[in-house]
Amino acid sequence: MSQTNSAAPAAAQAAPAATAQEAHELLREVVQGRRLSREQASAVFAALGAGELSEVETAALLAALHARGEEPQEVAGAASAFRQAARDFPSVSFPLVDVVGTGGDGVGTINISTGAGLVAASLGVAVAKHGNRAVSSKTGAADVIAELGLPLDVEPATAVELLARDHFTFLFAQAYHPAMRHVAPVRKALATPTIFNVLGPLVNPAHLTFQLMGVWDPGMLDMIAEAMVQLGRE
């Protein structure tokens, strides 16, 4: 479980979006197997979110990163870029928790983090559940929420009211991160884990106090832990 350090506003550390030419140069670096700094990763993912990369270029970026293995500073930089571009979410006066997983195990499992979050909420824990539809599994958090008949796109003010009253709200990644619309078709077509499996849990727009995160690959634990530290979480 990770605790957020509010003294380190990671979103404010995002680099400006790279120009189309700069983004293409950084893409070539990744395809050639080179590592990006946090600032470079932030810039290229800000450009991706702004629609500067084509679907083919986006697929090449995601595939190349996954093939050689994402680095902590690359994940932190990409997360900073998307948090910077996210829809604002109000601060609250009570502790917030998210129960989330990376997904991406590739064996068609079902989503259990949403159920775990609802159980926690029934015990009085305020859960700001952030999630999306399934990419490589049978169900994602958003699929579960929709099946339960709950609304996917809730206004931030309403979400805060639900947290105070019911101890649970769902923050749909596509609604809070409009920049992700540029990558959703590519992720669906690739149907394989990408950096976005890690980014999803790290870009919750709510100001979390604690986060419980499941990781499908034990080999990624150290990398994700280091990325979380770089994002100011304890």
Language-model features: locations:
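Acidic, glycine/proline-rich low-complexity segments that act as flexible tails and inter-domain linkers
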Residues: S2-G108, L123
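Structural motif
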Residues: A60, P95-D98, V125-A128, D143, ...
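A glycine-rich phosphate/pyrophosphate-binding beta-strand-loop-alpha-helix module
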Residues: L62, I110-D166
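Acidic, glycine-rich active-site loops and adjacent beta-strand->loop/helix elements
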Residues: G101-G106, G131-S137, Y176
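Amphipathic alpha-helical transducer elements in NTP-driven molecular machines
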Residues: P156, P218-L221
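Phosphate/diphosphate-binding glycine-rich loops and adjacent basic-rich segments that engage nucleotide
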Residues: T158-V215, A225
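Oxyanion-binding "anion nests"
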Residues: D222-E234
